[in-house]
Design a protein with these regions (language model features):
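Surface-exposed, charge/polar-rich loops and edge strands
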Residues: 1-330
């Protein structure tokens, strides 16, 4: 069936966007989609009725945003999208001057040159290690709809984040504290996969038909032993909870491609069959986000009514907002 992307446009009031993170993540709210019941996230473990398998994305947001001044005058911002090798990276570049191949920039702490120009991004060659640049000069990149404030940075990574190279957080995990994870681990199994979230996650759909939208590509990896646990859970009819759309896309890709690592541009549409997950926990997504296609898939045509209900109930949306739990019917 052909779907129009205008189905995924809705009115999101500015005051429904949580500009500030929950200082205590357990104070956030959880909407249980099936019953429309709203609970405090701290009580999440109480609704897990039988031993289950939980899949989290542990990819860590790196300090990829570098804001500095050119020695010649004027500010400059470099946003590292992905590292090619020790000294080369694909980046976004914000500077008032004309950007041409071969142009060199000098700053107090580092220098770089434009080696190639892509569609909206640049291949930059730096005179210092990019890892050193990230560690010494980088800032956490907050989403474009969140007002930048360094006091928010420490709340934008999950408590279990480790490894990987994400430039945006898999934010469904932000609701989980170490205490809640420990409580879940008593009767359930927890595994961590890796999907490196890239900046394409924020790009709204700009075509008329859903099938014409090209979703962003992201690197993923799953340990062999952990995928074995997923297979065992399916064989035993043990419920599987994917925490976040990135976890869902990674495990579905691994299943369909019979590959535990690689690059995925898997686009879950309303009529796509979901093979692995029984439940999806996710935040509320922005209008025209391709992720709303997943919401449409797991909840049905009335997903927008559920979103209206969440807004009317005072729930908060987007990265620092509240969460919703979907039961995925076969």
């Amino acid at each position: 069936m052909s779907y129009h992307t205008k189905l995924y446009d809705y009115d999101l009031p500015p005051n429904s966007i949580n500009q500030n993170p929950y200082r205590h993540p357990e104070d956030s709210s959880l909407l249980i989609a099936e019953s429309k019941k709203i609970i405090k996230f701290d009580n999440f473990d109480s609704i897990i009725s039988q031993p289950s398998l939980f899949i989290f994305n542990s990819s860590k947001v790196r300090n990829v945003r570098i804001v500095t001044n050119k020695l010649s005058g004027g500010s400059i911002e470099v946003f590292i999208l992905n590292i090619i090798d020790e000294f080369n990276a694909r980046c976004l570049l914000r500077s008032s001057d004309k950007k041409l191949i071969g142009k060199k920039y000098n700053t107090k702490n580092f220098n770089f040159e434009i080696c190639d120009i892509y569609d909206g991004s640049y291949l930059l060659n730096f005179d210092i290690s990019i890892e050193k640049l990230i560690d010494e000069d980088g800032l956490i990149p907050l989403p474009p709809y969140i007002k930048d404030d360094q006091s928010k940075y420490k709340y934008y990574n999950n408590v279990y984040a480790s490894g990987g190279f994400s430039v945006a957080s898999p934010t469904a995990g932000l609701h989980f504290t170490k205490d809640l994870l420990n409580k879940l681990n008593i009767k359930n199994e927890i595994i961590f996969i890796n999907l490196d979230v890239n900046i394409g996650t924020f790009k709204p759909m700009q075509v008329e038909k859903l099938n014409d939208h090209k979703i962003h590509s992201e690197n993923y990896s799953i340990k062999k032993a952990d995928f074995k646990k997923i297979e065992q859970a399916k064989n035993k009819n043990k419920p599987i909870y994917t925490i976040g759309t990135t976890s869902l896309r990674a495990v579905e890709t691994a299943f369909l491609n019979n590959s535990l690592s690689g690059v995925t541009d898997y686009f879950i549409k309303p009529d796509t069959q979901i093979h692995i997950s029984d439940y999806l926990l996710t935040n509320f997504h922005a209008p025209m986000s391709s992720l709303l296609s997943i919401v449409h898939n797991v909840y049905g045509d009335n997903w927008n009514h559920l979103y209206d209900y969440a807004i009317e109930s005072g729930l908060k949306f987007l990265s620092f907002g509240d969460a919703v739990l979907f039961k995925i019917d076969e």
